[in-house]
Amino acid sequence: HPASFLDLMQNFTLFQPVDGRLIKKVARYQQYRAVNKVMERLMNGTTRKEKSGVVWHTQGSGKSLTMVMLAVKMRRDPELKQYKLVFVTDRTQLDGQLSKTFRDAQNETIYNAGSVAELKELLSKDSSDIVTAMVQKFQEAEQEGDFTDLNPSDKIIVLADEAHRTQFGGLAMTINAALPN
């Protein structure tokens, strides 16, 4: 399929600098399929439930790269490029790696929330920024309270990498209260 090949070249081939060389990374099948399924849901879903979901990939399958490829493809789509993207991770190393990978792929400013106050400010802004935050910032916000209705926009996507705690319980309620749509 020529269209699939072109899509693979345009949206699923990234170059990352490593030790002074550029390394080409091309999506594996599960990454290609996951990104396109998410894009389909975002473009065709009419409710929050229809637009949301979980992508489950095994350890070492390239989940972070899948998220970066999704962001790259969204930024190239006229309907989805205005979305704010919020990356939630559970490890400092993963947070830094994700920011660097996206910066290398897209050459776009990434805003890292270093505190709860900074996170509130970044989430409140009505913009198409890319924000990264450690899951601990949401936990701290949950403990502090006053983290509701920060941004009512329906043009916000939260992508959690290895942050299972964001899916259920109090932490999920905190994120949903802050970003209700």
Model-inferred region functions:
Residues 1-84, 89, 93-109, 126-127, ...:
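ATP-dependent helicase/translocase motor core
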Residues 59, 162-165, 178-181:
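Conserved helicase ATPase motor motifs in RecA-like P-loop NTPase domains
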Residues 72-73, 77, 173-179:
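Basic, amphipathic juxtamembrane/active-site segments
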Residues 92, 113-121, 135-140:
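Conserved helicase motor
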Residues 109-114, 165:
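Acidic/polar loop patches that form or flank catalytic/metal-binding clefts of enzymes
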Residues 117-131, 149-150:
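Conserved motor-coupling elements within RecA-like helicase/translocase cores
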Residues 130-174:
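Conserved RecA-like ASCE ATPase "motif II neighborhood" in helicase/translocase motors
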